[in-house]
A protein has these predicted regions:
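Short glycine-rich anion-binding loops that position phosphate/pyrophosphate groups of nucleotides
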Residues: 60-64, 192-197, 225-226
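Proline-aspartate-enriched helix->loop->beta-strand connector
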Residues: 184-194
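Conserved beta-alpha
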Residues: 91, 95-176, 183
Length: 281
């Protein structure tokens, strides 16, 4: 991919506008269309060629702080082809350290863009995670707007992780990969919260990569986006989102997030202590 990144405290952050990032996802599916034809015949070499899953994460200050303390987690986050700049803290850090002004790319909004893309290209979407039937509720809400999209809930797994490895779950991921193949899922949204969802995506990516099949799939960590989409939690007003205060809105409705905000304070201090360097690549 040709997207530009900045490295913030060792974590890659995509520094492109939303449309450029979305265009890369379109290109991913365009390059992967099968079967490829040569003079009206299938090209067996193309059909045998495998393609890597396209990984999309949404690193926020808390994720960056954890990545600094956990090298394996940092490796996983940095392995993503797209790391959306979702959050005022990340935008501020990129501006301060890289002297680059970028706009926020909301993970929840980008998820909706991918659902629209799925409708345009007749792709099948899978959603995994969310508690108490949240994925099913989100699908019902999405299908009111995107009536022609095929979407399926794939369960609410309780997968423990340690050091980047899923515990006693190899069979689960193998079965999940088989289920993804059977249902022909081409976009998989994982809503397990960090860091579990990033570890989860790494494990399913490994299983998918083993198959060596020429079939594209996007794996995106969507965190709390299902709560917004389902209507369980109202989104902050547009003015608050534009001002970078959506975190305050969520904190007021979910006080348990205070521990995460403390990690955000640690991020703020570390950025202030980091010399300004241009680390674009």
């Amino acid at each position: 991919m040709s997207l530009k990144f900045a490295r913030i405290l060792g974590v890659n952050v995509t520094i492109e506008n939303e449309e450029n990032i979305l265009e890369e996802t379109r290109k991913y599916f365009l390059k992967s269309e099968i079967p490829r034809l040569i003079r009206g015949r299938r090209n067996p070499k193309s059909e045998k060629k495998s393609i890597n899953p396209l990984i999309i994460f949404t690193p926020n200050p808390e994720i960056v702080v954890l990545a600094q303390k956990d090298d394996e987690y940092k490796r996983i986050v940095n392995s993503a082809q797209i790391n959306l700049p979702d959050g005022a803290g990340i935008i501020w850090a990129v501006n301060r350290l890289e002297k680059v002004k970028i706009r926020r790319v909301s993970g929840a909004d980008f998820m909706l863009h991918l659902v629209k893309l799925a409708e345009e290209k007749a792709l099948t979407i899978g959603i995994i995670g969310g508690r108490g039937g949240l994925a099913v509720e989100a699908i019902e809400c999405l299908q009111k707007t995107f009536k022609d999209v095929k979407m399926e809930a794939l369960g609410e797994p309780e997968i423990d992780t340690k050091g980047g490895q899923a515990i006693d779950s190899e069979n689960y991921f193998q079965n999940l990969k088989n289920d993804i193949d059977k249902r022909k899922i081409e976009i998989l949204f994982v809503a397990l919260g960090f860091p579990k969802q990033e570890y989860f995506i790494e494990n399913i990516k490994i299983q998918i990569s083993k198959s060596k099949k020429f079939r594209p799939i996007i794996l995106m960590a969507v965190g709390g986006s299902l709560e917004y989409i389902s209507g369980r939690i109202p989104r902050a007003p547009g003015q608050m989102r534009r001002a970078g205060l959506e975190w305050l809105w969520r904190l007021a409705r979910q006080p348990w997030r205070i521990r995460r905000q403390l990690a955000g304070g640690e991020f703020f201090i570390k950025v202030l202590m980091t010399p300004n360097k241009k680390l674009l690549f």
